[in-house]
Swiss-Prot record:
Enzyme class (EC, first level): hydrolase
InterPro entries tied to this protein: Alpha_tubulin, Beta-tubulin_BS, Tub_FtsZ_C, Tubulin, Tubulin/FtsZ-like_C, Tubulin/FtsZ_2-layer-sand-dom, Tubulin/FtsZ_GTPase_sf, Tubulin_C
Organism encoding this protein: Encephalitozoon cuniculi (strain GB-M1)
Alphabetical keyword list: Cytoplasm, Cytoskeleton, GTP-binding, Hydrolase, Magnesium, Metal-binding, Microtubule, Nucleotide-binding
The protein's name: Tubulin alpha chain
Annotated gene: TUB1
Role: Tubulin is the major constituent of microtubules, a cylinder consisting of laterally associated linear protofilaments composed of alpha- and beta-tubulin heterodimers. Microtubules grow by the addition of GTP-tubulin dimers to the microtubule end, where a stabilizing cap forms. Below the cap, tubulin dimers are in GDP-bound state, owing to GTPase activity of alpha-tubulin.
Amino acid sequence: MREIISLHIGQAGVQIGNACWELYCKEHGILPNGQLDQNKMDDESAESFFSPTSVGTYVPRTLMVDLEPGVLDSIKTGKYRELYHPGQLISGKEDAANNYARGHYTVGKEIIEPAMEQIRRMADSCDGLQGFLIYHSFGGGTGSGFASLMMDRLAAEFGKKSKLEFSVYPAPKIATAVVEPYNSILTTHTTLDYSDCSFLVDNEAIYDMCRNLGIQRPYYTDINRVIAQVVSSITASLRFPGSLNVDLTEFQTNLVPYPRIHFPLVAYSPMLSKEKAAHEKLSVQEITNACFEPQNQMVRCDTRKGKYMACCLLFRGDVNPKEANNATANVKAKRTNQFVEWCPTGFKVGINSRKPTVLDGEAMAEVSRAVCALSNTTAISEAWKRLNNKFDLMFSKRAFVHWYVGEGMEEGEFSEAREDLAMLEDDYERISSNAEPVDEY
């Protein structure tokens, strides 16, 4: 069995986790108390994400950590309270106050040991641990500081195992904290060498998707359910049998041409409301084309200005290989999708026969087929550029820096992180002009 452990860190990580596990349970026919739904056939596919117990229940292979107890308390009293083992929900007593240094150096240090102990316990119960999925936000104190501390420890203890991130990136216009640019650049710098592949999501792009689904005022629940659908499509091939499945290491092999250039752009189609779905039946070609439209991207950036290095198309549901290959060939032939000269083929296709599932009360319609595109494109460097500019504006005045220094951080770490991000920006620039990134490790 190839098991995967999911780590949900900070408020965003835990709330996305809540939505994901709710969806996984429905997909695998697992009830909120961990028992199998008698109407669903028991297939072993659940065991890569769920651990079967001696009494016949299934427990998620997951750990949820937050430095303040509020969000985890709501899970402990919520609908799925019986699903998790109490040791899987670890909270501190005071939060990281949007401060990377608190999450990484002071408050985070107090709970890293119990968290690592729980991870070791879960890893020991696996037959063949494939790797870790880490869910967190860049902007929060716990999501940035504690996540990078944990990834540092994971690299030391489980060096060879894959580590994939699902990260909430600060949206261009919506900020949840003034110091988001600091936290984001510090965490990107610290995790750059530890993460094998990082899928970015920005709230603004998801807000727009929710509006397309007819949700006028999206709540975090709506946003997280959209993210959960996308994560489910990316992980479907790890959980269900399929004719062209993709495993964890295949993502890296096919999407990451250089170790640091590991931030694929994620797009998902179709995003249909129930009203629209009643009048539309989209073909494989149509949903594939839609994945290259800006409104279906998880991060705001202009792909026409960038070049593709690689693209992974993960189809699920009613799709046959011939249709998938034709759709891919047509996308490749389009002049707007430019590939770098040294990567002429550029497409990897995965097909999974299990169609997408939607949760009760969700705005999204149930469809017979969907596709998730993971594209490594130089256009995503726009996101780093925006963030670097915001960082520079604040750091030139040393604004808010004393909060970080007061928690044991050195001011030099800011400059070091910023230099690293400048190099990352430069690497993308060089690839765009068909040169190689500098100094390849």
